[in-house]
């Protein structure tokens, strides 16, 4: 029987797992935003067809794209998401006590819920606007 594996969300606390997401990352050599430095700053690579350099913090879920070779990932992260608790962690994942880890992961879970809630709210508002417009068009026919 092999060693138990961590849930995917917890695997992302390990830098090497974050680095492994940077397949086809455009900035590899002679750049400030290499996969290693991006991972150190908490980012994972989640490219889309229109945003091949899209990176997201696994902890605060802030998405950034439009990276330039000289961008400093930690500074960009601080600039766009200064309240991210991951930026203030001074220990490696393996060095955290269970209590420290659970407290940290509770913050990550709160961030995830907030991002998902905001996304659903935006989706609801867009649908409501379309329905409202359709109702107004029907009312105009009367």
Curated annotation (Swiss-Prot):
Gene Ontology terms for molecular function: cysteine-type endopeptidase inhibitor activity; metal ion binding
UniProt PTM comment: Ubiquitinated by the Cul9-RING ubiquitin-protein ligase complex, leading to its degradation. Ubiquitination is required for centrosomal targeting. Deubiquitinated by USP35 or USP38; leading to stabilization.
Renumbered ranges of BIR repeats: 18-88
Subcellular location: Cytoplasm; Nucleus; Chromosome; Chromosome, Centromere
Keywords attached to this entry: Acetylation, Apoptosis, Cell cycle, Cell division, Centromere, Chromosome, Chromosome partition, Cytoplasm, Cytoskeleton, Kinetochore, Metal-binding, Microtubule, Mitosis, Nucleus, Phosphoprotein, Protease inhibitor, Repressor, Stress response, Thiol protease inhibitor, Transcription, Transcription regulation, Ubl conjugation, Zinc
Post-translational modification Phosphoserine, affected residues: 20
Record-marked site positions (Interaction with FBXL7): 126
CC terms in the record's Gene Ontology section: chromosome, centromeric region; cytoplasm; kinetochore; microtubule; midbody; nucleus; spindle midzone
Main location as per UniProt: cytoplasm
Residues annotated to bind Zn(2+): 57, 60, 77, 84
Domain note: The BIR repeat is necessary and sufficient for LAMTOR5 binding.
Quaternary organization: Monomer or homodimer. Exists as a homodimer in the apo state and as a monomer in the CPC-bound state. The monomer protects cells against apoptosis more efficiently than the dimer. Only the dimeric form is capable of enhancing tubulin stability in cells. When phosphorylated, interacts with LAMTOR5/HBXIP; the resulting complex binds pro-CASP9, as well as active CASP9, but much less efficiently.
Summary of the function given for this chain in its UniProt record: Multitasking protein that has dual roles in promoting cell proliferation and preventing apoptosis. Component of a chromosome passage protein complex (CPC) which is essential for chromosome alignment and segregation during mitosis and cytokinesis. Acts as an important regulator of the localization of this complex; directs CPC movement to different locations from the inner centromere during prometaphase to midbody during cytokinesis and participates in the organization of the center spindle by associating with polymerized microtubules.
Protein name per its UniProtKB record: Baculoviral IAP repeat-containing protein 5
Gene encoding the protein: BIRC5
């Amino acid at each position: 029987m092999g060693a138990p594996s961590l849930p995917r969300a917890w695997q992302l606390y390990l830098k090497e797992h974050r680095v492994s997401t940077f397949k086809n990352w455009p900035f590899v050599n002679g750049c400030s935003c290499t996969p290693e430095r991006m991972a150190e700053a908490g980012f994972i690579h989640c490219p889309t067809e229109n945003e091949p350099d899209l990176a997201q913090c696994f902890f605060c879920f802030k998405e950034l794209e439009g990276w330039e070779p000289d961008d400093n990932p930690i500074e960009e992260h601080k600039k766009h998401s200064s309240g991210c608790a991951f930026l203030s962690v001074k220990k490696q994942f393996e060095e955290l006590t269970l209590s420290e880890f659970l407290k940290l992961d509770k913050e990550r879970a709160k961030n995830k819920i907030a991002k998902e809630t905001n996304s659903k709210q935006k989706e609801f508002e867009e649908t409501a606007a379309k329905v409202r417009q359709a109702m107004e068009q029907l009312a105009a026919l009367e």
